[in-house]
Amino acid sequence: MKLFTLVFISLVFLCDHVFGQNPPPGPLTHTFSIVARDSLSGEMGVAVQSHWFSVGTIVTWAEAGVGAVATQSFANPAFGPEGLALLKSDKTAQKALNLLIAADDGRDFRQLAIVDSKGNVATWTGPKCIADAGHITGEQFSVQANMMLNDRIWPAMAKAYREGEGDLADRLIAALEAAQDAGGDIRGKQSAAI
């Protein structure tokens, strides 16, 4: 019990030091992910890998004919269903992202990516996401990462997705493998979802 208390207090002080304030509530899903739409088949998907156990239950959200959402960093799990609902109401990916981010007091700590059924993509990386953090948005896809070993992770993901062969699932997995090969999550790997 003493060890737990010591670790807990240390984490509180670390968060206060790193963020200058208490981090917003939300699961600590520091990770890398990709959202994408295949321009030929129209398939959409989202894939994620992290040190965080059961990462797919928080980060990945998708609905056929609607879109795909990845919510991560100090994740706001409501972004998944709310993002899909906004897409269903004929909002573009960018409009949905703008509405979600504007209404969230914890936006500076969040990372969010959305692709809609037309292939429009929108991505947000808050300025207080744990480094290394960033994203690349390409034609009908976005890759995003935070708490990474280095800043080569998301460029490696984008390159692997663009140059990948096979169906959408193959290219999503290629992006995850490229991220891991480039250094991946600074804590290691324990969980993935597609």
Show the residue positions of the predicted features.
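Bacterial N-terminal signal peptides
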Residues: 5-17
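Alpha/propeptide regions of enzymes that mature by internal proteolysis
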Residues: 21-187, 193-194
